[in-house]
Amino acid sequence: MSAKLIKGTEIREEILKEIEAEVKEIKEKHGKVPGLVTILVGESPASISYVTLKIQTAHRVGFKEVQDSQPVDISEADLLALIDKYNKDDSIHGILVQLPLPKHIDEKKVLNAIDPDKDVDGFHPVNVGRLMIGGSEVKFPPCTPAGIQEMIVRAGVETSGAEVVVVGRSNIVGKPIANMMLQKGPGANATVTVVHTRTKNMDEHCKRADILIVAAGVPGLVKPEWIKPGACVIDVGVNRVGEKPSAKDPNKMVAILSGDVDFDAAKEIAGSITPVPGGVGPMTITMLMLNTLKSLKFKLGLI
C-alpha cells in the first residue's frame, strides 16, 4: 500500500489563506500591514527568481513588499547603512538579505546587522539562542525547519514520544529541526537522534525512526530498507540529477530533481512521505510570510 503524500503545495495554500485573512483583520482593526523588504545585491538569475517569488507571495497575502536591488559592487559599509535604515523604519517588520553576497562583503557581518526583531529568516545569533531556549522565547524559527514541523502537525503525525531521526547537521535545517522537535508543544516532545557523515551504522539509526527527516543533500542516500514500516518520511533534499525536455516546450530543457530518499521504493514502506518537488520546498517562503506577520503582531502587542 502506497504511503500518504504530505504535499507542501496544498499545505502552503491553507496557510497563505490564513495569513491573508489575518492581515485583513489587523489592517481593519489597527491600520497596519506587515512590511517585508528583500535586499538583492547583483543580478544572479537564481537570486532574482527567488526574490521575485518572495515578493509575489508577500503581495498576494496583503503585505507591504519592497524589493531593494543594489549593484554588485556596493560597498560593505553602504550595505550595512542600508540595513540600518530599514532597522529604523517602523513600516518594515521583516528584513531579508538574499544570499550569496559578493566576495568583498562579509555575509556574517551583514546578517548580524539585521535587528533580531526583524530577522524573519531566524538566523541572527539572538534568534538562534531564543530557539535553543524554546517556549515563549522563540520569535522566528528558521523557515525550512518551521515548515517541516508545520507539515508534520497538519498531516496528523504523532510526535510526542516518537523516535525522530534527523539525517544532516546543517545550521539551516538539521540542527534547528532537531532542537525544535525536542521542545515542549505541538509537533514536538520527541526523542531525537541526529546522524551525519561521521555516524557509524547510519542505516541502523534510521530503521528506528517513527519520523525520519532527511536533509543531507545526497540524492537517494536513504534506501528503502532503512525505513521503518509505517514511518513518516520528510525528504528535504532537492538535488539536480539531470535534464529533460519541458512538458510545455519540448525545445526547452528543465532540471530533473531528486530528493535524498529513494521515493518510489520508500513510498511502498512509509506510512506518509513528502514528494520532491512539491514537498518541503513550498513551505519555506510560506513560513517566511508567517514570521513577518508575527513580527507585526509582536510590534502591536498582539502576541
From Swiss-Prot:
Pathway annotation: One-carbon metabolism; tetrahydrofolate interconversion
Role noted for this protein: Catalyzes the oxidation of 5,10-methylenetetrahydrofolate to 5,10-methenyltetrahydrofolate and then the hydrolysis of 5,10-methenyltetrahydrofolate to 10-formyltetrahydrofolate.
Binding partners and assembly: Homodimer.
One Gene Ontology molecular-function label: methylenetetrahydrofolate dehydrogenase (NADP+) activity
Catalytic reaction list: (6R)-5,10-methylene-5,6,7,8-tetrahydrofolate + NADP(+) = (6R)-5,10-methenyltetrahydrofolate + NADPH; (6R)-5,10-methenyltetrahydrofolate + H2O = (6R)-10-formyltetrahydrofolate + H(+)
UniProt keyword Acyltransferase, yes or no: no
Superkingdom in the source lineage: Bacteria
UniProt family annotation: Belongs to the tetrahydrofolate dehydrogenase/cyclohydrolase family.
Upper lineage: Bacteria, Pseudomonadati, Thermodesulfobacteriota, Desulfobacteria, Desulfobacterales
Keyword flag Hydrolase: yes
Residues annotated for NADP(+) binding in this entry: G168, R169, S170, T197, V238
E.C. numbers: 1.5.1.5, 3.5.4.9
Protein's gene: folD
Swiss-Prot/TrEMBL GO biological process terms: L-histidine biosynthetic process; methionine biosynthetic process; purine nucleotide biosynthetic process; tetrahydrofolate interconversion
Any one GO cellular component localisation term in the record: cytosol
One Pfam assignment: THF_DHG_CYH
UniProt organism field: Desulfosudis oleivorans (strain DSM 6200 / JCM 39069 / Hxd3) (Desulfococcus oleovorans)
InterPro entries: Aminoacid_DH-like_N_sf, NAD(P)-bd_dom_sf, THF_DH/CycHdrlase, THF_DH/CycHdrlase_cat_dom, THF_DH/CycHdrlase_CS, THF_DH/CycHdrlase_NAD-bd_dom
Protein name: Bifunctional protein FolD
Keywords: Amino-acid biosynthesis, Histidine biosynthesis, Hydrolase, Methionine biosynthesis, Multifunctional enzyme, NADP, One-carbon metabolism, Oxidoreductase, Purine biosynthesis
